[in-house]
Amino acid sequence: MSLISAVEDRDIHNIGKTSGGGSRTSSITSSKKSLKHGSKSLRKPKVYQTTGEPLSREALYKAKLKYGVYQSPAQSYSIGVSDAHAASDKAANLAHDNQTTVEAYKRMFIDPNATKAASKMGPKVVRNNSITSATSKTSKESQTKRKSKESPGAAASKAYSMTMETTSLSSQTNSRSYSITSASSVLSGASGSFNSTVNPKPKTLNLEKVLVGAEKKAESRIKERWEPEKTNFQYGVKTDEHGNLNQFSFSNEMMNNIMAKVDAPKAQDLQKVKKVSAEKEAKSMKFALGAANAVKDMHPGADIDKSIALKAQKRETYLSQLTSQQVLTLARANVDRQLDIIEKSDMHRKLFTNMEYNKAAVAVAQSNHQKKTEFHNKINMGGGLFLSPEDITKIASGLISPVLGEVSERAEAQRAMDEEIAERTEAYNKSLNEWETMERSIISNDAKVLTTTANRHQTEKKTSQEKIKASFDALVARMDTKVAERETLLEDTKNKEIEFKKQMQQELKDEKARLDQDLEEWGKKCEQDITEARKEQEELLKPYHDDLANAEAEHKTLVEERDAINAEISRLQDAIVDHKRKISGYGNDLDAQKNRNIREDDKLLELGQTKESLESHLNDDVIILANKAKEQAELSTKEARLKQLEVDSLINERKSELNATEIELKKEKLNLLEAMKDVASARGDDKIAEEKVKKLIGMTSEEYLTQNKSVEKNVEDLPTQLEKIEEGDELKKEEIVGAETKNSGGDGVPVSTGAKEAAETSSAVQTKEPEEKISIGNKSSGKEDANDCESAEHSKEISVSQKAGNNKSLGVSPDSLEHTFSGFSQGSSIEDDQDAISNQEKK
């Protein structure tokens, strides 16, 4: 059994057609292609990515290029033609067809994109010559190709680039020449200007820059094709192997060394010689370029050296002879000589035209054939391994026999498994038949059971329906009797409710009349108290307008009182907010109670509550209304108190301003007395003029000073009096709070009269003068005690009436309680103060 098939006929045909230079590599690749397992035809490779999608055309092309499907650059020919038989004829034809005129070297095949770009720029645009670097990255093979394809004036252009440029050419072409291509482009422009008769065509378009760019692009493309980047593909997946594809590319030098059988040291010496010559050429070009750049900016009319003029003249004559017949013949001779050199240098590659080389090759082949007799009737496995067909069959049997044994074992196991499957299917079919018979019997039995159960259910249903109907009739009769009893009870409760509502309305009217009478009496009492307080204030305010010290003390006390009033205002505002919140809560409770009454009315139809439960719920409603009326009364008192305090604060501010002006007046009088004393002392008098002092102040200086001393004593006694007054105020406030808590702790009846009287008395005490505050506080405390007694009696009466089910304050609303605040309950009015001041000044 052989693992290697014979070589196909088409591969043998390709092997016979290969040239001498590429015979070895092409035979290897063809033999590799022919080593296929079996004699099947080549199928199109199907390469997919990891995701299952096929690769792109570019990836397939690069993969084929990697594995040698296409002719790689390592197997191509750098010089000459592919067919060695027609090499000499092809060279002769090219030399004959190549015309040695300037017109023949126009580029006939130009990239259409380049022509489009140049035509867009327009014919009037003057293009500068391109500047290319002296050290080009092109390989030596591309340079030799370009040398063979250049015009006959290439050598002259090279010499021209190494010489100096004249001033006339520098004015026309403002560019530097760094390479042979740029020098040739400049030469073509200069020759056109010198010999216009030879080439009379007008210069319509300058494509030099475009062509140079196209040439660079072509060189880069050739380099990419010659040395492509190795993109490592393995069925579309990249690996970590990197490097160039042409790792073992056969260059021209390598092929020359292989065919000439040159040793390694000789090849190295040859490379060194070539490197030195290239460096010399580069240096000479550099020196020539420096010289040309040195004289390019010289003016044409300036005097120059004779030697330079002679060189320029020789150069002009040389340039004028470039297009002559002699130059053309010399150029043709140079081309022929160069072609002969190329043919002679490549004679060792021409296997079919060189008979001597063919004879030597046949001799070498015979000697190699004699040496290879040891590998007769053996197959080349590659890598220097030759095996006989017997060895290959042994290896194949050793590799395949274990596989065949495994196949036989698996076949036996499969047969046993098939037998077991057949037995299992037979047993399964038997059990399935038994199961089907059992199912049929079950279905028939179920049909019988269903009929019997249906009959039994019908009889049970009839009996149960009769029982339910009898029980339902009894329930309906029983519930009808209950409904009649509840309806009679409901009528009785409705009649009682109507009578109770009438009774409550009459009591509310009586209570409202009594409260109105109390309010009128209380208003009269308040007016009398206000008039008495005003009289007392007028009597007490007279002495304080005369004293400076007392005015200062009063100013301080008023400031303190203002702060206390502001604190009281803030506290009362908080209390008002609290009372409003409570009133809103009571309103919510009333709404809830109304909803509850509605629910209770509905429940009366179903449950039939008794009279006691209805009376208890109605009492709760009355209590909530009483609490609401109480909070509204307290709110009205607090609002009245707040307004009184605001007015008191305004009065105190006015009085503080008045006292400040009086203090300033007293200070000015003292300053006047001091100034008069200074004037008298300056004159030498011991006393001042008392008559002038009386006219200005209204009293003598001694009287004024004694009066000020008494004021100072009064000022010293004021703090103790103020402390006592503050203690009295605190006691009164505590008593008022206690009375309110007592009233609130009762059954919810508001005691508005006592609270208002306490507020009036406390406000009157705060605005009276410091000397009389203690006595006024005692009087007000007595009034408060009386009011507390009255409020206690009222609370007792109201509690008794509530127990009886009568509420006195049900019809009282916050709008019905009229405010009794007069606006000037504390302190004196501004007009009274002004009258007092005018009377004091008259005195």
Swiss-Prot record:
Phosphothreonine-modified residues are where?
A: 720
Its BP terms in the Gene Ontology are: eisosome assembly
Compositional bias segments (type: Basic residues): 33-46
Keyword Cell membrane assigned: yes
The molecule here is called: Eisosome protein 1
Mark out the compositionally biased spans (Polar residues). 127-137, 163-174, 798-810
According to its UniProt entry, this protein's organism is Saccharomyces cerevisiae (strain YJM789)
- Annotated signal sequence range: none
Write out the annotated subcellular location: Cytoplasmic granule; Cell membrane
Q: Where is this region: Disordered?
A: 1-53, 120-174, 718-843
Name the UniProt key words of this record, in alphabetical order: Acetylation, Cell membrane, Membrane, Phosphoprotein
